[in-house]
A protein has these predicted regions:
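Outer membrane beta-barrel
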Residues: 1-116, 121-128, 132-141, 194
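Detector for outer-membrane/organellar transmembrane beta-barrel domains
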Residues: 132-195
């Protein structure tokens, strides 16, 4: 893991997994204001509480939930195996700041849709949006949306998610629901959902 600041509002991170080997994260961030920031590179998609806010070292279980793995690119039903990451550009920020957190947060990104270390296979870009509400310290309520087309056949990939989490001190309570529709190469669509 190599991270640092180029300037007071400009930083970067490069994380490599040497076992594979592959680049896991490689991005640059420009953070001019609390309300408007820009990130460019390869990194975790801003979809779901568990994919965005919980890294394996912080996670309580040995594996991510099946719904997240099957619908967000860990072992996706569309064939992606990307640990919830992709290449793209994202705007993000927060409003109504309190001590250490923003009450309202947003993420909006445009991504390749092919996953980790993979060149784009079509001309379509995938869109990901997330809104987060934190009414009090430790409590987070979030909603996510993902729209994209994958592969050279431009097969549909749509995901929705909603969840809540309380993480303060020794207490962590988290619930999340994710659903999606995936176009299949043989024709038809697969609808999936899970908690």
């Amino acid at each position: 893991n190599l991270a640092g600041a180029i300037a007071p509002k400009l930083d970067y991170r490069v994380q490599i997994e040497f076992a594979s080997p592959k680049i896991v994260d490689a991005y640059i961030r420009y953070r001019p204001f609390e309300q408007l920031n820009f990130q460019l590179g390869e990194y975790k998609l801003p979809f779901s509480i568990e994919n965005t806010d919980y890294v394996p070292l912080k996670y309580e279980f040995i594996e991510y939930p099946l719904s997240l793995r099957r619908l967000m690119g860990f072992n996706d039903v569309c064939g992606l195996s990307a640990t919830g990451r992709d290449m793209g550009a994202m705007l993000y920020g927060g409003f109504f700041n309190r001590k250490g957190y923003s009450v309202l947060g947003y993420n909006f990104g445009v991504f390749n849709g092919e996953g980790l270390n993979v060149k784009d296979k079509n001309k379509s870009k995938d869109l990901v949006a997330r809104l987060t509400l934190r009414p009090v310290r430790g409590l987070q309520i979030a909603g996510s949306y993902y729209w994209g087309e994958y592969g050279s056949d431009y097969l549909k990939r749509v995901r929705y998610g909603a969840g809540a989490c309380y993480d303060e001190g020794p207490l962590v309570v988290r619930a999340e629901w994710i659903c999606g529709t995936t176009g299949l190469p043989a024709g038809g669509e697969l609808d999936s959902d899970g908690w």
